[in-house]
């Protein structure tokens, strides 16, 4: 039997980052730490029962309950005010169906990738490991070397030792050793996520990137490369040409150049121990006021990015042509690529929740037309202003933006664009639930009617997330543009991203069906009369035909 002890909440400094959650729910690598912990245990002990302890009154979100169910682990509720020893005694007295099994215990704020397999052992570490300074300060000398993983061959002897220990786990170990000898083992691949510094050490070692990006984090510096050389050069251009007054919204740009192969372009930024908003949105428990404050900071960024003192160099940029490129040509060319790889029919009728929406092409045409009707708003455009590219500094109440686009409609290096695109990227994280798709927190539900098949996408939304989305939809980020006005662009974003996730067909399907959901909920029901967009539809059809013929 394996017990992951996570019945207390994270400490105050971590709670300020992610909200009041138990340590096993901390986000790492766009997953909950529990997912990594259980995955590692399954590698070594595939048939052992796994129990995770949680605070007695901690209410699981729908999303968290889904993770628990998928991992097939049992949950035991334990009062968060009792000691580690009392918690273990409580669990062992309840779990009466495994009287002779080995007991393996992992503290919930630890992540072990090489789990010891020996019996009756205590995992220990070298006292010189700097990330453990906090634990050495708080614990006794003997205990300070304990990593947080223990194995006991006798449940009966362990229960007896815990009962005699008077709330002290080290004392329980002493009593257990009176009966059974315990060895010390030293794992080499592990992380301690009990406090701020060590948690971010773990995060920097477990990075996430898509197939076309690569990140190296070392000595406080992030080095980024990519298979797409123009993409990296464009990001370098954006960082190096950003006006000084806007640089407070980004990490420090340190260096750029080519690697030793003389071919691969790279650039370096300072590494900031900050959480991206996507992980807070999917895995955190941050309250509504936190997100309201975050939206205020984003609005502040939009205000500075639209400052007229930065836009004097925009004379040569044709905003109409650039908007047409972003919303029309880009979407249609990406759809063409997706059509070729998937053999999907772009002209077949689509049904969502029993409503006929038209074809993918019809949806695309309408959304393009609606976006091209919006007023032009030139700004210094980030170009990929989604939650995963926004780091939040809780102490300084600042946003730090990463991974900009840096290209205009002609694929020339540029820092300029239209604010509607940045706002659409933001909405595709909040309302579009993009980060839930990337984290695998969705379900595709299929139904088959007499004349067609129908698919819907379901997200595990709780009341808190619904309130955040409601706040977002009502928030005025840019004067003269409502969030609902840019929802057609969000639909286009999901359609245009389909070929970029070719390595994950499940995500591609989710993004396509999610585009239908967004169109049905935020565009279809708000549609204006067709006569007002006929000219744009004709224009889009001409572009579409040109792309297909190319």
Annotate the PLM regions.
Residues 210-241, 270, 277-284:
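ATP-binding glycine-rich loop module of kinase domains
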Residues 278-342, 353, 358-374, 381, ...:
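Conserved kinase catalytic-core helix
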Residues 59-136:
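Conserved beta-loop-beta/alpha segment of the NTase-like Rossmann-fold superfamily
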Residues 110-185:
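Conserved core of the sugar-phosphate nucleotidyltransferase
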Residues 458-550:
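ATP/Mg2+ or Mg2+-diphosphate-binding catalytic cores
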Residues 365-417:
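Active-site acidic catalytic loop and adjacent metal/ATP-binding pocket
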